């Protein structure tokens, strides 16, 4: 039996039950409930207004946009932010039995933003026997009069509680902390956009255990590494019973940016960031005919019923669901309700092996839109993406891949460059075989390398190394950049010697043009920041009969005056940023130009891996000396931009790895 009820007009109270699953409607609300989870939707807002697990209120009282969710909002109308359901929310109920014999019920929000005609849909589904909500989100734009509207800058769903129930937030084992107390928040000091200092409440648990600084970016993560994040209640405010609220990324194919996309996860709100440019990656344009359905993802609520389970145990339970094969039969059954969702009948698999270069570690195989760099797949708004960790023999398997043509990209820690193969055809119901060999790039004999090519600047000072000053030891880069003191770390600037210096101590995770001011130091430093020195020695044998040298620089991120907007501003002299490399006494530099559309807000938003930029620069080998040599890495001195938010104006680059080759 399938029941479909339009709820745009108020109706009398009605209840339809199927086993434990029940749908109830009155003039103002719709309620979906099974034996354990009850979710109530407000008709006038088009969002979840109440959520109970085993009788425990998970949201708390509504206050503005808190005490609600999951709900959908965006930064996508001409003026900026919009919450779906704000104009003319129309809710619709669907019910049925899926192919496994399990009852389900769903609520679908339909809303149109009248000034532009943008259509929003948000889907929530509850199954019998589950304690979570399956979600899909859709945006459509059909407007021939204004064929280009703007970019889709943010598109997200939010679980936004307003209750003392939740005590901890977590996005990984290393990013787990107590939530700051009300007292800490009341006495916080703003130090940057969405960043606060808790120095006025030094006894707060967050301060003593995790950090003096709090920012939502501390809990951001790469999509490669992130499948589950959320909130935990340790029982302090729930009579000893523990609870978890999790966003489970069981599918990632409708996000953009591939496995290196990083985004916000949790900060007291549990986010599902479907689209954003927080760390500088591209976003799709909203043009006539744009029609995109994101999902599914799953908001899981667990614990309860006297649970004493730890945060780690409840998170592990959520992690078991973070698999695109989980509930695939159910999603096939509800595809008839979800506009734009591709069921299994439109999906195939890719099975392959790429012979890897010697020294490869953590290899990964990525499918993204054909003909485009994998971080740029948002240029094709309808594109899908997939990736899988590879075996050390280069084997990989990708299932549930939507039919179409893809680019295969492989990269691995320890190897410069990527393997790229276009034209991988995926057909529904079939297995596509791939057999390739990755011949790593080479410009001769490698003389030296600095850093590990791994798409990250985390191996350098204040990167991935754990913070020794707090017992939870978060990686240092997750903490606000201003917690560190450049003048103390590098009073004479960076002067690194190949073979004797320690990259974790003597090479910073970010090359600033300007540093400061910080909360602890009002000084602004630009004399020791913009030029870095790398010393290296070559013997006569290394240079014998060598004609060409090649310097490779890979950047894990770079911020130009364009910030993360991808917009060129002619009034900003550093919209395109030149990183210049000077060899010994040569007057002409080798130049890596970071374009305005390659810029990212990386370290200032607590990240060490953002939009990747690289260059291989040749020069005559006779520029090099037998004996001592000096490479100077130069950024423009005191180069800044105009910032509308409370953010540092300096430009900067973050090195992934460098190497010198001779041929």
Curated annotation (Swiss-Prot):
EC numbers on record: 4.2.2.23
Catalytic activity of the protein: Endotype eliminative cleavage of L-alpha-rhamnopyranosyl-(1->4)-alpha-D-galactopyranosyluronic acid bonds of rhamnogalacturonan I domains in ramified hairy regions of pectin leaving L-rhamnopyranose at the reducing end and 4-deoxy-4,5-unsaturated D-galactopyranosyluronic acid at the non-reducing end
CDD domains to which the protein is assigned, alphabetical: RGL4_C, RGL4_M, RGL4_N
Enzyme superclass (EC): lyase
Keyword Zinc on entry: no
Signal sequence region: 1-19
Glycosylation site positions: 27, 110, 143, 239, 285, 495, 535, 569, 597, 638
One function term, GO molecular function aspect: rhamnogalacturonan endolyase activity
PANTHER family named in the record: RHAMNOGALACTURONATE LYASE B (PTHR32018:SF9), RHAMNOGALACTURONATE LYASE FAMILY PROTEIN (PTHR32018)
Family under the similarity heading: Belongs to the polysaccharide lyase 4 family.
Protein's UniProt name: Probable rhamnogalacturonate lyase B
Naturally occurring in which organism (per UniProt): Aspergillus flavus (strain ATCC 200026 / FGSC A1120 / IAM 13836 / NRRL 3357 / JCM 12722 / SRRC 167)
